[in-house]
């Protein structure tokens, strides 16, 4: 006869065919409050041990059992089986939750490692920021030097233009002085021309007076001559009348000749003086006219040059004003650019400080997360140890119950963890003698790990400069602690297996008092583990 048993913990859900014999399952109403997991290996070994023990030790006693006892046992076995399934499903769900929690923590750890890598890259980036800042400063300095060079060039140009302006002003002053001299000479020439004109008018008047005098003298001479002629005629008549009168004609002719010579001489001298004076006045007038014309030409040329120089001066003034405005604009622009660059420098420095503070905050958060991770790893290791100890205890107690529980002829199958007469699993379960010491060792390890984590948290409050080194060292220490924890767990498992093999026979012979004492010890160990877990959770909440 074969029956199908369903194992829900295989990866592909399978049904196995097991040769069934009259098996007696063990009743237990205990529901473990501790966090345990189901191991397929333990399940298969327990089932095999149940099969072998039932096939070897229960076959002779089947004939002596009543059908009512068999029915009661089968109903009890069904109840125990359903309870076991419920417990195993609960443990499986809890184990799956633990695995999901571990995966979630691993994902968070990866995310935190990526963030740490980014933060380290950002921490290494200030050199590039410094290069960018120095490049920007160099560009600003080059621009400032170029602006200073342009400013110096403009200043030199301004000085050159100022020198040219001073030269032009000097020439303008010289031209003004020469103009004043020319105007003064022109005034003198005008005065001389006026004097020459007055002298000419005077000479003309004098010439008119002399001509009138000559005419008057001619008239007087003619009258005298006529008188003399009349007198001569009268004298001749009288002489003729008076027969012996003197001859006056020769004397008159002599006087007339003398007067004519004197008149001709005076006329010639007057004409010569008039001609010489007229020539002198004509030459002086012509000379003054040439001087006036030259002065007028020079004055017009001076006026033209003065207007040209005035235009040049105005142009130079406009250029000077434009250059001054350009210099002022360049100075304003440079001051604005320098202020902008200074603002950019201040902004970059502020960003650098913010980045450093943010990086320190990220490092602090990463340190806290590392501490939380280490605490969670410690808690997981503690739970793992508790689960492994529970599985070991269950396996050993199951084996001891099967080997030593059915030695009596009565339906009472011995005092084991799955005794049919036990009403509560908490009061009648039998533990190995070494399990209490094993739990105490685990509690000591947990306390040592907690102390080490506290010490590391105290070290985490070092200055910001040592945070990276401390984080790396703690990361390495965490890995070494995990490796040591795994090695210690493996060693403890090996020791547990060896001690379990040696003490399998002793477990069946232990009394009810020892089982209760060991149960109390296990309860104390579990309570200590729960207290340690609660302390860790409180620490996590405080840190958060």
Curated annotation (Swiss-Prot):
<keyword id="KW-0206">Cytoskeleton</keyword>
<dbReference type="GO" id="GO:0033693">
    <property type="term" value="P:neurofilament bundle assembly"/>
</dbReference>
<feature type="region of interest" description="Coil 1A">
    <location>
        <begin position="88"/>
        <end position="119"/>
    </location>
</feature>
<feature type="region of interest" description="Disordered">
    <location>
        <begin position="450"/>
        <end position="544"/>
    </location>
</feature>
<dbReference type="GO" id="GO:0030424">
    <property type="term" value="C:axon"/>
</dbReference>
<keyword id="KW-0007">Acetylation</keyword>
<feature type="region of interest" description="Tail, subdomain B (acidic)">
    <location>
        <begin position="436"/>
        <end position="544"/>
    </location>
</feature>
<dbReference type="InterPro" id="IPR018039">
    <property type="entry name" value="IF_conserved"/>
</dbReference>
<feature type="region of interest" description="Coil 2B">
    <location>
        <begin position="275"/>
        <end position="390"/>
    </location>
</feature>
<keyword id="KW-0963">Cytoplasm</keyword>
<keyword id="KW-0403">Intermediate filament</keyword>
<feature type="region of interest" description="Linker 1">
    <location>
        <begin position="120"/>
        <end position="132"/>
    </location>
</feature>
<dbReference type="GO" id="GO:0005737">
    <property type="term" value="C:cytoplasm"/>
</dbReference>
<dbReference type="GO" id="GO:0099160">
    <property type="term" value="C:postsynaptic intermediate filament cytoskeleton"/>
</dbReference>
<dbReference type="GO" id="GO:0005882">
    <property type="term" value="C:intermediate filament"/>
</dbReference>
<comment type="similarity">
    <text>Belongs to the intermediate filament family.</text>
</comment>
<feature type="compositionally biased region" description="Basic and acidic residues">
    <location>
        <begin position="526"/>
        <end position="544"/>
    </location>
</feature>
<feature type="region of interest" description="Tail, subdomain A">
    <location>
        <begin position="391"/>
        <end position="435"/>
    </location>
</feature>
<feature type="compositionally biased region" description="Acidic residues">
    <location>
        <begin position="463"/>
        <end position="525"/>
    </location>
</feature>
<keyword id="KW-0175">Coiled coil</keyword>
<dbReference type="Pfam" id="PF04732">
    <property type="entry name" value="Filament_head"/>
</dbReference>
<feature type="region of interest" description="Linker 12">
    <location>
        <begin position="229"/>
        <end position="246"/>
    </location>
</feature>
<comment type="function">
    <text>Neurofilaments usually contain three intermediate filament proteins: NEFL, NEFM, and NEFH which are involved in the maintenance of neuronal caliber. May additionally cooperate with other neuronal intermediate filament proteins to form neuronal filamentous networks.</text>
</comment>
<feature type="region of interest" description="Head">
    <location>
        <begin position="2"/>
        <end position="87"/>
    </location>
</feature>
<feature type="region of interest" description="Coil 2A">
    <location>
        <begin position="247"/>
        <end position="265"/>
    </location>
</feature>
<feature type="region of interest" description="Coil 1B">
    <location>
        <begin position="133"/>
        <end position="228"/>
    </location>
</feature>
<keyword id="KW-0966">Cell projection</keyword>
<feature type="region of interest" description="Tail">
    <location>
        <begin position="391"/>
        <end position="544"/>
    </location>
</feature>
<dbReference type="Pfam" id="PF00038">
    <property type="entry name" value="Filament"/>
</dbReference>
<dbReference type="InterPro" id="IPR050405">
    <property type="entry name" value="Intermediate_filament"/>
</dbReference>
<dbReference type="InterPro" id="IPR006821">
    <property type="entry name" value="Intermed_filament_DNA-bd"/>
</dbReference>
<protein>
    <recommendedName>
        <fullName>Neurofilament light polypeptide</fullName>
    </recommendedName>
</protein>
<dbReference type="GO" id="GO:0099184">
    <property type="term" value="F:structural constituent of postsynaptic intermediate filament cytoskeleton"/>
</dbReference>
<comment type="subunit">
    <text>Forms homodimers (in vitro).</text>
</comment>
<feature type="modified residue" description="N-acetylserine">
    <location>
        <position position="2"/>
    </location>
</feature>
<feature type="region of interest" description="Linker 2">
    <location>
        <begin position="266"/>
        <end position="274"/>
    </location>
</feature>
<feature type="compositionally biased region" description="Basic and acidic residues">
    <location>
        <begin position="451"/>
        <end position="462"/>
    </location>
</feature>
<feature type="domain" description="IF rod">
    <location>
        <begin position="84"/>
        <end position="394"/>
    </location>
</feature>
<dbReference type="InterPro" id="IPR039008">
    <property type="entry name" value="IF_rod_dom"/>
</dbReference>
């Amino acid at each position: 006869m074969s029956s199908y048993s369903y194992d829900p913990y295989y990866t592909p859900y399978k049904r196995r065919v097991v040769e069934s014999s009259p098996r007696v399952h063990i009743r237990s109403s205990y529901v473990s409050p501790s966090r345990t997991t189901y191991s397929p290996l333990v399940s298969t070994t327990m089932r095999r041990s149940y099969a072998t023990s039932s096939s070897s030790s229960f076959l002779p006693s089947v004939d002596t059992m009543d059908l009512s006892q068999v029915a009661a046992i089968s109903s009890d076995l069904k109840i125990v089986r359903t309870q076991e399934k419920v417990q195993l499903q609960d443990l499986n769900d809890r184990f799956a939750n633990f695995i999901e929690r571990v995966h979630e923590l691993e994902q968070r750890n990866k995310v935190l490692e990526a963030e740490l890598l980014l933060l380290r890259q950002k921490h290494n980036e200030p050199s590039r920021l410094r290069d960018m800042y120095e490049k920007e400063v160099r560009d600003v300095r080059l621009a400032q030097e170029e602006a200073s060079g342009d400013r110096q060039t403009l200043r030199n140009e301004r000085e050159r233009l100022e020198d040219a302006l001073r030269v032009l002003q000097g020439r303008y002053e010289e031209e003004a002085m020469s103009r004043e001299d020319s105007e003064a000479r022109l005034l003198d020439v005008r005065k001389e021309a006026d004097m020459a004109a007055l002298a000419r008018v005077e000479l003309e008047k004098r010439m008119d007076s002399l001509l009138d005098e000559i005419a008057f003298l001619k008239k007087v001479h003619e009258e005298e001559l006529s008188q003399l002629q009349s007198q001569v005629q009268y004298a001749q008549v009288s002489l003729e009348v008076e027969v012996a009168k003197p001859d006056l004609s020769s004397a008159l002719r002599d006087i007339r000749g003398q007067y004519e010579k004197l008149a001709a001489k005076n006329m010639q001298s007057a004409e010569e003086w008039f001609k010489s004076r007229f020539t002198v006045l004509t030459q002086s007038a012509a000379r003054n006219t040439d001087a006036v014309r030259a002065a007028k030409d020079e004055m017009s040329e001076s006026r033209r040059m003065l207007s040209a120089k005035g235009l040049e001066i105005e142009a130079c003034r406009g250029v000077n004003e434009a250059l001054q405005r350009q210099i002022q604009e360049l100075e304003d622009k440079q001051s604005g650019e320098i202020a902008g660059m200074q603002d950019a420098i201040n902004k970059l420095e502020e960003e650098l400080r913010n980045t450093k503070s943010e990086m320190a905050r990220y490092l602090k958060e990463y340190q806290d997360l590392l501490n939380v991770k280490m605490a969670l790893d410690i808690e997981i290791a503690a739970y793992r140890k508790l689960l492994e100890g529970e599985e070991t205890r269950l396996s050993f107690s199951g084996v001891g119950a099967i080997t030593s529980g059915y030695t009596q002829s009565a339906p009472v199958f011995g005092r084991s963890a799955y005794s049919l007469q036990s009403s509560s699993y908490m009061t009648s379960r039998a533990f190995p003698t070494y399990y209490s010491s094993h739990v105490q060792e685990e509690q000591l390890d947990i306390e040592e790990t907690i102390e080490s984590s506290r010490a590391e948290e105290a070290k985490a409050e070092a200055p910001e400069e040592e945070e990276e080194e401390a984080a790396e060292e703690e990361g390495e220490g965490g890995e070494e602690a995990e490796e040591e924890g795994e090695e210690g767990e493996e060693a403890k498992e090996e020791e547990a297996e060896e001690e379990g093999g040696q003490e399998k026979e002793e477990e069946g012979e232990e009394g009810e008092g020892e089982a209760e004492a060991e149960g109390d010890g296990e309860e104390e160990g579990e309570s200590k583990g729960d207290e340690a877990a609660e302390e860790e959770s409180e620490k996590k909440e405080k840190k958060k």
